[in-house]
């Protein structure tokens, strides 16, 4: 069963501060995928996903929500930049490649799930192959394997193998030889490249080559080989296509960068042309991929953009209509910065503490020190460009510069980063607008 909206928001809260409206929107959209699958077949086809447009300044968590969502979804997920595409007929990536790449992701996902499902059987088969190398079965004069009475010896070796007692012993095994075919093609023809590679690799016979390696490494290689044998490629493709059609999620970032600006009337192959090409895919069409035909009717699209120069109304009206749910992400405050520095599971202050601990240096961030760091980042954002939480990275790097450089010579020391320490390290740069513009 899929996670509930409350559980999804709770997971996102562990990594992203604030932006509850955006978290709720993506949580509901994810849960609706599960709800739809519980409906009768005829009604299920009629329920289409409500695509989302996330609007907010840079550095407030739009892309981070996408990254974390990919891990939670357990479904085919791809994140693309809208600026990477050009209109059909021009040099560059076409919009159709989004669905082709999503299908490739789905094939890998379904394959890894199938391999995991068969791992126990594959493990047994791999152990048998290694035991055959360690205890070769006796053969008669015609080369046929004879029934041997070494089953008890075999069980002893199997026990040792499972306990790791034979891990460092070297053996020579036959492994599948990977045929690598490198093909150079002009930009925008990646699809043809992959098809030619598949063709040439399929023409080559299944060869094996002998390799010498430690038993623990050989076991991993053989488990993967045996698991791959237990998987039906055609069945995998069908499952992958179904996973894309029913559960696929596409996150399109920088959608504001393909808005038409001003009264420019010429052809615009990487802006309005891309919007026109996106329309049928988001609305629902069929895309031909190397794995088969994929319908996009029920793929969920989440678009995001800063919209600092353009506005959502600058998008094509038809595209606006296909993104019915609008979510606005708020600019971050000083209090948000303080929470970002301390609350997430892998907060910035924790990262620096652990990094310095590897050199034997103990770092302690006091409450007033964290408050001062947050205030400095907030002030620089106000005085120069507002780049959101990314400003914390530059401020902290500047603050920790001296410690990072000298840490290897200060093993055993404890350094307390309080308000005075931050004031002394950053005051000149924060107060001087010219310096903060170029350094922070």
Swiss-Prot record:
UniProt cross-references to Pfam families, sorted A to Z: AAA, AAA_2
HAMAP family: HslU (MF_00249)
GO BP terms, alphabetized: protein unfolding; proteolysis involved in protein catabolic process
Protein name: ATP-dependent protease ATPase subunit HslU
Coarse class of the protein's main subcellular location: cytoplasm
Superkingdom of the source species: Bacteria
Record-listed ATP binding positions: 17, 59-64, 253, 318, 390
InterPro entries tied to this protein: AAA+_ATPase (IPR003593), ATP-dep_Clp_protease_ClpX (IPR050052), ATPase_AAA_core (IPR003959), Clp_ATPase_C (IPR019489), HslU (IPR004491), P-loop_NTPase (IPR027417)
Function: ATPase subunit of a proteasome-like degradation complex; this subunit has chaperone activity. The binding of ATP and its subsequent hydrolysis by HslU are essential for unfolding of protein substrates subsequently hydrolyzed by HslV. HslU recognizes the N-terminal part of its protein substrates and unfolds these before they are guided to HslV for hydrolysis.
Keywords of this entry: ATP-binding, Chaperone, Cytoplasm, Nucleotide-binding
Family (UniProt): Belongs to the ClpX chaperone family. HslU subfamily.
């Amino acid at each position: 069963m899929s996670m509930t909206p409350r559980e999804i928001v709770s997971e996102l809260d562990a990594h992203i501060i604030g932006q509850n409206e955006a978290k709720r929107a993506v949580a509901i959209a994810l849960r609706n995928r599960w709800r739809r699958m519980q409906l009768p077949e005829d009604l299920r086809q009629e329920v289409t996903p409500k695509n989302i447009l996330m609007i907010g300044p840079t550095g407030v968590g739009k892309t981070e929500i996408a990254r974390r969502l990919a891990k939670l979804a357990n479904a085919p997920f791809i994140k693309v930049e809208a600026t990477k595409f050009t209109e059909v007929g021009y040099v560059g990536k076409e919009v159709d490649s989004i669905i082709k790449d999503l299908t490739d992701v789905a094939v890998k996902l379904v394959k890894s799930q199938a391999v995991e499902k068969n791992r126990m059987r594959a493990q047994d088969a791999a152990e048998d192959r290694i035991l055959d190398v360690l205890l070769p079965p006796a053969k008669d004069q015609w080369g046929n394997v004879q029934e041997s009475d070494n089953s008890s010896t075999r069980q002893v070796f199997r026990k040792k193998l499972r306990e790791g007692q034979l891990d460092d012993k070297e053996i020579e095994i036959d492994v599948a030889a990977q045929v690598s075919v490198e093909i150079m093609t002009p930009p925008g023809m990646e699809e043809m490249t992959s098809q030619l590679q598949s063709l040439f690799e399929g023409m080559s016979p299944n060869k094996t080559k002998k390799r010498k390696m430690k038993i623990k490494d050989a076991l991993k290689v053989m488990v993967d080989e045996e698991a791959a044998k237990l998987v039906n490629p055609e069945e995998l493709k069908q499952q992958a296509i179904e996973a894309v059609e029913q559960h696929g999620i596409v996150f399109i970032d920088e959608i504001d960068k393909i808005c038409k600006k001003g009264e420019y009337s010429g052809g615009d192959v990487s802006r309005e042309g891309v919007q026109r090409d996106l329309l049928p895919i988001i609305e629902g069409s069929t895309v031909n991929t190397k794995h088969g035909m994929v319908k996009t009717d029920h793929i969920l699209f989440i678009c995001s953009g800063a919209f600092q120069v353009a506005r959502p109304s600058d998008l094509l009206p038809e595209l606006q209509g296909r993104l019915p749910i609008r979510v606005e992400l708020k600019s971050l405050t000083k209090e948000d910065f303080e929470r970002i520095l301390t609350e997430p599971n892998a907060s910035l202050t924790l990262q620096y503490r652990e990094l310095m601990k590897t050199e034997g240096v103990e770092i302690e961030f006091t409450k007033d020190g964290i408050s001062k760091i947050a205030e400095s980042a907030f002030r620089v954002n106000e005085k120069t460009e507002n780049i959101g939480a990314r400003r914390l990275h530059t401020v902290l790097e500047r603050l920790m510069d001296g410690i990072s450089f000298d840490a290897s010579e200060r093993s055993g020391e404890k350094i307390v980063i309080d308000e005075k320490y931050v004031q002394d390290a950053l005051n000149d740069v924060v107060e001087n607008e010219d310096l903060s513009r170029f350094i922070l």
